[in-house]
Each structure stands twice: as structure tokens, then as C-alpha cells.
């Protein structure tokens, strides 16, 4: 008698992400007093839509990379502090790799691949930073495997590293993510952050890792019935005016949640 695999159903609630800014009375007076002659200032003042939309998009990317690197999404902004746990097994997060030049990196990676296989998964990609890739390329054990005993000290090019991974572990896709974004601190100064940590490696067995689920925000719903164009509308821009103080507000809104198709792999 046959049996069906256990059916797993996951329910997620998408998070509303908003960013807004206003054209103050002072800005509007400057514009009406002839600032419009300076194209750079005009772009600075009236590029609010793109800037706010980019801010929402960046926040979704931060959320995705947070989940990809930790199995959790951490929120600590606008007086809201919470953690969304995606249920990644603790044993999948317990590896502390030694990436020094003399370390047995290949043995450590083989242990990860073997554990994934024991759980029924085949790793097909490693996601990391260029800093980690450079450490792999300067590891003596990896250099010896590629160039022989006389090749220690020879830097390993990325294509040779991918070839070695493909031969030993069955996957040759090593994706690096080193983009950065800026946030504004309470004192008005800016801080630069990485989307993906520079000292981590994420091994995946499903091709959909790093994706997210978009939904219809309240602002988008206010525009009317869902239609064909709505299918390609992820971030909604709205504008409105306030009488006192006189200001024009621009707001970008998106409804989004990162998705892990299979937290175990």
C-alpha cells in the first residue's frame, strides 16, 4: 500500500512597507521664486516618486537577504521591533566555518554537502561575498587540489574554484552579493550597510531562494478594480496636499513578504 508524502501548508501575512516625503512650504516658495531655472534642483525636488519607490524596493531586498542569510527577518524601525522566524532547522544554521589559509575548508564543505544529502537535498548553489571567495582562493588546501603541491601560494581564479566545487560537490554556482544601501540615523547622518553579510555562506537546494511575494496594497486597491496592468504593479505611488502647512506629500507603498519555498533546504 502506497503512502503520500506529508502535505505542508504555510500561511504568510505580507507586510506593508511605506515611505513618504513632503515638499514643504519653503521648498515650494523656492520653486516659485525661480529655482525652476536650475535643472539639478528641479530634479532634486521633483524626483520624490523615484526616490520613495527605490526606498521601498531597497527595504524588500534587505528583507530577502536577511532571510537568506539567517533564516529570519528582523524588523527594528519606526518603533516596531519583531522577528519573523521561517523555521529553518537549527542544525542547518549550526556550521561555523574556519576559512583561514591552513584550514581544511574542503572537509568542512563536504560535511555540509553530506548533511544535506542525508536530509534528502542536493545543494545546487552557494551564495556569499567576494571576501569569502577571496579566502577560498587563498586557502592552501584548495590551491594544492587545483595546482598541485608546488602550486601553494597561487591565487585560484573564480572559474577554477567553480570547477573544483562542481567536481567535488556537484555544484559550480557560486553567487556573490556585495551591494550596499544607506540608512539615515537619528542624528541625520547616513550609515552604509550590506544587503548580505560579508562573512557568511548560504547553501541552497531550491532554485527559488531569494524570492518574495507581492500583494495588493490598500493604496493600489483604492485605484480601482484589479486589471491586467495591476499584475505588473508592485509599488504604488500616491500624492496628496495638506492645506496648513501647505505641503505636497509623495508616498510609495508596497505589500511584500520574503518567501522560503522549503525552510529545510
Describe every region a protein language model picked out.
Residues 1-31:
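Assembly/oligomerization interface modules of large self-assembling protein complexes
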Residues 25-47:
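Active-site-proximal, glycine-rich beta->alpha crossover segments in alpha/beta enzymes
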Residues 52:
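RNA-binding accessory domains that recognize and position tRNA/RNA substrates
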Residues 61-78:
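Short, glycine/acidic-rich hinge or "gate" loops at secondary-structure transitions
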Residues 81-157, 164:
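Extended, solvent-exposed, turn-rich assembly/linker loops in the middle of proteins
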Residues 143, 147-265:
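Sequence/fold signature of self-assembling virion shell proteins
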Amino acid at each position: 500500500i502506497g503512502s503520500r508524502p506529508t502535505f505542508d501548508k504555510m500561511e504568510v501575512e505580507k507586510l506593508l512597507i511605506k515611505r513618504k516625503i513632503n515638499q514643504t512650504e519653503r521648498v515650494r516658495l523656492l520653486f516659485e521664486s525661480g529655482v525652476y531655472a536650475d535643472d539639478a534642483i528641479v530634479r532634486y525636488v521633483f524626483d520624490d516618486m523615484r526616490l520613495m519607490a527605490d526606498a521601498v524596493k531597497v527595504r524588500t531586498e534587505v528583507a530577502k537577504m536577511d532571510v537568506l542569510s539567517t533564516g529570519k527577518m528582523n524588523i527594528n524601525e519606526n518603533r516596531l521591533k519583531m522577528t519573523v522566524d521561517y523555521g529553518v532547522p537549527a542544525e542547518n544554521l549550526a556550521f561555523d566555518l574556519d576559512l583561514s589559509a591552513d584550514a581544511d575548508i574542503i572537509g568542512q564543505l563536504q560535511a555540509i554537502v553530506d548533511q544535506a544529502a542525508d536530509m534528502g537535498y542536493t545543494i545546487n548553489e552557494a551564495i556569499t561575498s567576494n571576501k569569502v571567495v577571496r579566502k577560498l582562493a587563498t586557502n592552501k588546501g584548495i590551491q594544492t587540489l587545483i595546482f598541485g603541491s608546488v602550486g601553494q601560494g597561487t591565487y585560484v581564479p573564480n572559474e577554477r574554484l567553480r570547477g573544483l566545487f562542481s567536481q567535488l560537490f556537484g555544484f559550480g554556482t557560486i553567487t556573490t552579493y556585495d551591494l550596499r544601501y544607506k540608512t539615515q540615523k537619528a542624528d541625520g547622518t547616513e550609515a552604509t550597510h550590506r544587503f548580505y553579510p560579508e562573512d557568511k555562506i548560504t547553501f541552497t537546494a531550491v532554485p527559488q531562494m531569494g524570492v518574495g511575494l507581492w500583494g495588493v496594497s490598500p493604496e493600489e486597491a483604492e485605484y480601482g478594480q484589479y486589471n491586467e496592468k495591476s499584475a505588473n504593479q508592485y509599488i504604488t505611488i500616491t500624492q496628496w496636499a495638506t492645506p496648513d502647512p501647505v505641503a505636497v506629500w509623495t508616498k510609495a507603498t508596497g505589500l511584500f513578504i520574503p518567501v522560503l519555498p522549503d525552510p529545510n533546504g
